[in-house]
């Protein structure tokens, strides 16, 4: 049985009460801020978080929220799954462009700090390692599905004026999610 949470994560005491009442075996965090409306214009990418005054939302939704869920899950012995991001890495000497033979792994530290989003998510990723005995940290990149949806990466790029041709990682959600469920079951 799957239940959606009703409490905003910044309301920690109410969230803890809801978790205690529902008493789940697993908690899954799909929390994250990558888009929003700024001055009446919808911005569907992390460019939204680069706008003035968006630090609060970025930290609340991309750091505080997931960490609150992970800490409450640990406290109450619920397995916690965090869908984080791989947008915290860039090519470097150990991972040269065009030579994808040795990728980043679970122990890799973030090395991309080119956006507010990546900085905050990079620190969230590092903090998740402090509770890794009770956390499954899944790093996804540019999620795609076969559905037409404004949050689907394929749908997004059809609206871009320019597209660069650089090899990159993408997450095919219908293929990934069964593996995530298996990993959650096997904790």
Feature map (PLM): residue ranges:
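Catalytic helix-loop patch of NAD(P)-dependent Rossmann-fold dehydrogenases
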Residues: 51-65, 87-138, 145
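A short helix->loop->beta-strand "cap" motif at the edges of active sites that frequently abuts
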Residues: 75-78, 133
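Conserved cofactor-binding/catalytic machinery of classical short-chain dehydrogenase/reductase
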Residues: 64-68, 79, 123-124, 172
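A short beta-strand-loop structural module common to alpha/beta enzyme folds
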Residues: 1-9
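NAD(P)-dependent short-chain dehydrogenase/reductase
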Residues: 114, 126-182
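SDR active-site strand-loop-helix element
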Residues: 30-31, 80-86, 138-140
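NAD(P)H-binding glycine-rich loop region in Rossmannoid oxidoreductase-like domains
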Residues: 9-63
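Core catalytic loop region at the nicotinamide-binding pocket of NAD(P)H-dependent oxidoreductases
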Residues: 183-187
């Amino acid at each position: 049985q799957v239940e959606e949470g009703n409490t905003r994560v910044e309301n920690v005491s109410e969230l803890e009460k809801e978790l205690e009442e529902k008493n789940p075996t697993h908690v899954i965090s799909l929390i994250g801020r990558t888009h929003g409306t700024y001055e009446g214009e919808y911005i569907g990418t992390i460019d939204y978080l680069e706008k003035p005054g968006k630090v609060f939302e970025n930290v609340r939704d991309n750091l505080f929220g997931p960490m609150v869920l992970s800490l409450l899950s640990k406290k109450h012995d619920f397995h916690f799954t965090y869908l984080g991001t791989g947008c915290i890495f860039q090519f470097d000497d150990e991972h040269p462009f065009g030579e994808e033979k040795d990728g980043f792994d679970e122990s890799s530290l973030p090395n991309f700090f080119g956006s507010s989003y990546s900085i905050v998510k990079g620190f969230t990723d590092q903090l998740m390692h402090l509770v890794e005995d009770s956390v499954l940290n899944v790093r996804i990149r540019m999620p795609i599905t076969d559905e037409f949806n404004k949050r689907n990466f394929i749908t997004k790029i059809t609206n871009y004026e320019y597209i660069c041709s650089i090899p990159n990682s993408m997450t095919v959600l219908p293929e990934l999610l069964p593996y995530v469920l298996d990993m959650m079951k096997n904790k």
